[in-house]
């Protein structure tokens, strides 16, 4: 996005990573916001501040944490952990829509192929992703025919640190056979930012 001349506002709970990005890019290219995406006060304050920079053209909701266990091993903490992604998606979407006056904005919900099927040992994670899909589909119906465009993205199997706490489920060797995040991001962005008079509403991307 920055390479295409966009001003990007990035949100993360990782202050160290945000400091690295802030050092890498000038203020007119990147603004960092550090906090909990499920903290409503933080969301409201952040969106209000971002809106002072100009109209918000694109919101990308990409947060999520995995929990891979056999069905009987799940506890309440696992459910809460997975649901943070859904709650954050809703809060950021609502505040962004308000800030934009529900006009001229594209919202990309980055979910997972787990939102399209049931996977063994991912019951709670799948339940959360199906919830995100349901929310996204409802938004698409609510804003059909308007200048609010909602895009559902379902990528599956990406070579990142996402699986670092689940090595009994996805080994490091297996992880490295998954999609690379760079080319995946390029494919997603190609569909999100272009001059064509169309919107690709659903994108499912599977590894080879």
What are these regions (language model features)?
Residues 6-18:
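Conserved glycine-rich Rossmann-like NAD(P)H-binding loop of the short-chain dehydrogenase/reductase
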Residues 44, 65-78, 121-124, 163:
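Conserved mid-core segment of classical short-chain dehydrogenase/reductases
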Residues 48, 52, 84-104, 141:
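Amphipathic alpha-helical dimer-interface segment in Rossmann-like NAD(P)H-dependent oxidoreductases
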Residues 56-64, 85, 109, 151:
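Rossmann-fold scaffold of SDR-type NAD(P)-dependent oxidoreductases
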Residues 65, 72-91, 108, 132:
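Catalytic Tyr-X3-Lys loop
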Residues 100, 117, 138-148:
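Active-site-adjacent segment of SDR/Rossmann-fold oxidoreductases
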Residues 112:
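Residue(s) in the substrate-gating loop at a strand-loop-helix junction
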Residues 148, 152, 172-208:
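C-terminal helical subdomain
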């Amino acid at each position: 996005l920055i390479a295409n001349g966009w001003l990007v506002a990035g949100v993360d709970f990782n202050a160290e990573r945000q400091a690295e990005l802030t050092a890498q890019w000038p203020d007119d290219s990147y603004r960092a916001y550090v906090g909990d995406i499920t903290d409503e006060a933080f969301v409201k304050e952040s969106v209000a501040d971002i809106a002072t920079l100009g109209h918000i053209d694109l919101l990308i909701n990409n947060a999520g944490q995995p929990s891979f266990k056999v069905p009987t091993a799940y506890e309440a903490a696992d459910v809460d952990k997975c649901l943070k992604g859904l709650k954050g998606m809703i809060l950021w979407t609502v505040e962004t829509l308000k800030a934009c006056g529900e006009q001229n904005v594209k919202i990309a919900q980055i979910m997972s192929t787990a939102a399209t099927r049931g996977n063994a040992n991912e019951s709670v994670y799948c339940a959360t992703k199906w919830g995100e899909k349901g929310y996204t589909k409802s938004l698409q119906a609510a804003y059909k025919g308007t200048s609010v465009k909602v895009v559902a993205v379902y990528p599956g199997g990406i070579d990142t640190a996402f699986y670092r706490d689940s090595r009994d489920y996805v080994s490091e060797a297996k992880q490295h056979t998954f999609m690379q995040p760079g080319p995946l991001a390029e494919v997603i962005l190609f569909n999100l930012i272009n001059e064509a008079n169309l919107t690709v509403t659903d994108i499912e991307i599977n590894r080879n």
